[in-house]
UniProtKB/Swiss-Prot annotation:
Protein name: Branched-chain amino acid permease BrnQ
Organism, scientific name: Escherichia coli (strain K12)
Keywords in alphabetical order: Amino-acid transport, Cell inner membrane, Cell membrane, Membrane, Transmembrane, Transmembrane helix, Transport
Protein's job: Liv-II branched chain amino acid transport system, which transports leucine, valine and isoleucine. Also acts as a low-affinity threonine transporter. This activity has probably minor relevance for normal cellular physiology, but BrnQ may form the main entry point when the threonine concentration in the external environment reaches a toxic level.
Membrane topology: Multi-pass membrane protein
The keyword Cell wall biogenesis/degradation appears for this protein: no
Membrane-crossing segments per the record: 10-30, 46-66, 80-100, 119-139, 150-170, 190-210, 227-247, 278-298, 317-337, 339-359, 370-390, 405-425
Taxonomy, superkingdom: Bacteria
InterPro entries the record matches: Brnchd-chn_aa_trnsp_Livcs (IPR004685)
């Protein structure tokens, strides 16, 4: 007998997916864009939504079609290359960068204003924080109950309060856009959404969503795909509504902060202005819940993935990943971002290429011909973008600085599109040769 999810479980799955996506970066970036974009806020918002909502939802759908794992999604590039890509992806959005960052961001926004940002408070906070992350992550079968039915609703309630306040009680009027947004509001919004790295997160979370449905007794592939797609679409709608409210919050906060302020400062100023003395506590609770849920999802997904390739149990890996993330988090937010941005900028393009081209697999004689070369090119030019975003940008040759869209951090895009066209021509030509030789 085919087991189907109840409506309540489907909604909980959607809540869980939304909650897994919304980390501190998702709450901080939109107000920054809104403040700096000024009168061009909705043009910038459109660009932001394409990369911060459209691409991640597309990734969830792509993963659902192959059963939830990035290793399955990457079969056209070969097993070794696929496992290597998946490993790099999981490490980057797991214990090396994204998971530790959830602790440092929640500390600096919620705790540091009270304790100062010295090493000891951060160490104590990270110890408690990752103890909770490990405890929740040890029971993946209960993830839907813990996150979908408890933590996610708390998180959503806090976000709804903030979003409604931003619309009902604007802090002031819209200021004039900065020079960058006056000249290119759409592309700046597009790049800021790209830098949230949610597509990488989606590649990791896909297997978490599928396994959460499996834990409710769903085994049929068709139903697993359907429920995962529904969860992704529900999360996409939630993200869009949240981002639009946060854009409004940022665009109306020009009277509270300088236009160069970061997202945490904008949120803190707005919440203090609107909610008074309790504002700091509300913001701290919001960021803590957002970061904690994201960290749990990342830890579960990474442990599930590495358990397939190393002779360690899932529970042992949860302890290792949680402990390692705690150690890395004590580098502090600024240093962690400085190290992570170039690496993430380099590995993001081939992941985008893989996700987009995965929907075309059935169109080609040999999907490897069409998918592998563009991924390789996107990685090469993504590395150039990564170097440009690092402290070693001076070593880049002058031609690399003059590439189309290089200023926007998207130098990989045009060469990848050209390679896709060439790969399609190659596939058609090689396919015809095979057909003619068969007669």
């Amino acid at each position: 007998m085919t087991h189907q999810l109840r409506s309540r479980d489907i909604i909980a799955l959607g809540f869980m997916t939304f909650a897994l996506f919304v980390g501190a970066g998702n709450i901080i970036f939109p107000p920054m864009v809104g403040l700096q974009a000024g009168e061009h806020v909705w043009t910038a918002a459109f660009g932001f939504l394409i990369t911060a909502v459209g691409l991640p939802v597309l990734t969830v759908v792509a993963l659902a079609k192959v059963g939830g794992g990035v290793d399955s999604l990457s079969t056209p590039i070969g097993k070794v290359a696929g496992v290597l890509l998946a490993t790099v992806c999981y490490l980057a959005v797991g214990p090396l960068f994204a998971t530790p960052r959830t602790a440092t961001v929640s500390f600096e926004v919620g705790i540091a204003p009270l304790t100062g940002d010295s090493a000891l408070p951060l160490f104590i906070y990270s110890l408690v924080y990752f103890a909770i992350v490990i405890l929740v992550s040890l029971y993946p079968g209960k993830l839907l109950d813990t996150v979908g039915n408890f933590l996610a609703p708390l998180k959503i309630i806090a976000l709804v309060i903030l979003s409604v306040a931003a619309i009902v009680w604007p802090a002031g009027s819209i200021s004039t856009a900065t020079e960058a947004y006056q000249n290119a509001a759409f592309s700046n919004g597009f790049v800021n959404g790209y830098l949230t790295m949610d597509t990488l997160g989606a590649m990791v979370f896909g297997i978490v969503i599928v396994n959460a449905a499996r834990s409710r007794g769903v085994t049929e592939a068709r139903l697993l795909t359907r429920y995962t797609v529904w969860a992704g679409l529900m999360a996409g709608v939630g993200l869009t509504l949240l981002y639009l409210a946060l854009f409004r919050l940022g665009s109306d906060s020009a009277s509270l902060v300088d236009q160069s302020a970061n997202g945490a400062a904008i949120l803190h100023a707005y919440v203090q202005h609107t909610f008074g003395g309790g504002g700091s506590f509300l913001l701290a609770a919001l960021i803590f819940i957002a970061c904690l849920v994201t960290a749990v999802g990342l830890t579960c997904a990474c442990a599930e993935f590495f358990a397939q390739y190393v002779p360690l149990s899932y529970r042992t890996l949860v302890f290792i990943l949680g402990g390692f993330s705690m150690v890395v988090s004590n580098l502090g937010l600024s240093q962690l971002i400085q190290i992570s941005v170039p690496v993430l900028t380099a590995i993001y393009p081939p992941c985008i290429a893989l996700v987009v081209l995965s929907f075309t697999r059935s169109w080609w004689h040999n999907s490897s011909r069409v998918i592998a070369p563009p991924m390789f090119i996107s990685l090469l030019f993504g590395i150039l973008d990564g170097i440009k975003a690092s402290a070693f940008s001076d070593i880049l040759p002058s031609w690399a600085q003059r590439l189309p869209l290089a200023e926007q951090g998207l130098a990989w895009l045009m060469p990848t599109v050209v390679m896709v066209v060439l790969a399609i021509i190659w596939d058609r030509a090689a396919g015809r040769q095979v057909t003619s030789s068969a007669h």
